[in-house]
């Protein structure tokens, strides 16, 4: 879990900015969004397959150009 030690003369806004950056690096917000609603394993598989297909098409287009 991210944590920020605040120095005496350090403003709150700066500490908050550091904390948000640490949370972003740790991937906490994306994990929360992902777990917000339950997703059936079959739906997860479908989404994963669609994403793989998109990546493959993008890679092909890049090679053609």
UniProtKB/Swiss-Prot annotation:
GO terms for cellular component: ribonucleoprotein complex; ribosome. Gene3D superfamilies: Ribosomal protein S8. It holds the Pfam family Ribosomal_S21. One of its GO terms (molecular function) is structural constituent of ribosome. Keywords: Ribonucleoprotein, Ribosomal protein. GO terms for biological process: translation. Belongs to the bacterial ribosomal protein bS21 family. This is Small ribosomal subunit protein bS21. The gene is rpsU.
């Amino acid at each position: 879990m991210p944590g920020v030690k605040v120095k005496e003369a350090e403003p709150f806004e700066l500490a908050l900015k550091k904390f948000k950056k640490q949370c972003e690096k740790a991937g906490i917000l994306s994990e929360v969004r992902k777990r917000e609603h339950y997703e059936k394993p079959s739906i997860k598989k479908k989404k994963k397959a669609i994403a793989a297909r998109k990546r493959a098409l993008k890679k092909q287009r890049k090679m053609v150009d």
